[in-house]
Amino acid sequence: MQKLLLAVLFFSLLAVATARPKYHKQGRRKGDACRLNCIFDNVVCEIPCKLLFRSRSKYIDCVLPCRRDRVDCYIHCNHFDATPKTEAEPGSLDKGEGTKGEKGKEGKKEKGEYAIGNAESGNGSSGGSNKTHDDDDDDRDDVHENDDENED
């Protein structure tokens, strides 16, 4: 029992020493960073319970306050998502930003738009094989039909 308590103490000190990761400084949105902090805090809270209690009922009793804290933390994180955005975030498609490629300088397409245009039309300018995924499925279906006829 003493070894177990020392292990719990050691892991608790280790968790405190490593501190919470700084998700907000990694370029994450505030809401996502808040949720990741909630998960980290929940894991750190549950570790001693996992080490101390082997029976399910005692473990659940031990973890119950941790789970309540996690739910409260998530509710607090919804506050960050509910705040109105004054500026569009980079990479988001707000109010017609998706059509920028069509309005490029001198009628040139942007890098990503060319690939999307080829994928939608199915016509490539390389002059290579024009075999599509549907052709492969048709060939495979023909083989299966022949196999069914041979089994009779």
Swiss-Prot record:
<protein>
    <recommendedName>
        <fullName>Aspartate-rich protein</fullName>
    </recommendedName>
</protein>
<keyword id="KW-0964">Secreted</keyword>
<feature type="region of interest" description="Disordered">
    <location>
        <begin position="82"/>
        <end position="152"/>
    </location>
</feature>
<keyword id="KW-0732">Signal</keyword>
<dbReference type="GO" id="GO:0005576">
    <property type="term" value="C:extracellular region"/>
</dbReference>
<feature type="compositionally biased region" description="Basic and acidic residues">
    <location>
        <begin position="82"/>
        <end position="113"/>
    </location>
</feature>
<feature type="compositionally biased region" description="Acidic residues">
    <location>
        <begin position="135"/>
        <end position="152"/>
    </location>
</feature>
<feature type="signal peptide">
    <location>
        <begin position="1"/>
        <end position="19"/>
    </location>
</feature>
